[in-house]
């Protein structure tokens, strides 16, 4: 999985997660107090999709999507990170919203 550190220190990293679209990316945040978080973008639309590696029919490339999901699962484990799935309403209800924040 290719990546680019935005500030050069690994605290904000753009990760290549192609499949949904040819140039799809996810954003990794290394937060000193809140821990490591990966914002999934459209890598998975719901937790159930993620847990069962289900890919929507409208994705650009199913095989690339599954490979990106597998690579991301390893990345999450290696970096002790949690995955935030933007479209998952149940997960979204359990995270802080403005004006609250993560540090």
PLM segments and residue spans:
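Short, small-residue-biased leader/transition segments that mark boundaries at the very start
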Residues: 1-2
């Amino acid at each position: 999985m290719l990546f680019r550190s935005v500030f050069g220190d690994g605290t904000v990293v753009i990760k290549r997660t192609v499949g949904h679209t040819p140039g799809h990316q996810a954003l990794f945040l290394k937060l000193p107090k809140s821990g490591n978080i990966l914002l999934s973008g459209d890598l998975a639309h719901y937790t159930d999709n993620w847990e069962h590696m289900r890919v929507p029919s409208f994705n650009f490339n199913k095989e690339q999507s599954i490979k990106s999901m597998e690579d991301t699962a390893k990345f999450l484990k290696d970096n002790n990170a949690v995955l935030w799935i933007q479209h998952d309403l149940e997960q979204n209800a359990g995270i802080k919203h403005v004006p609250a924040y993560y540090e």
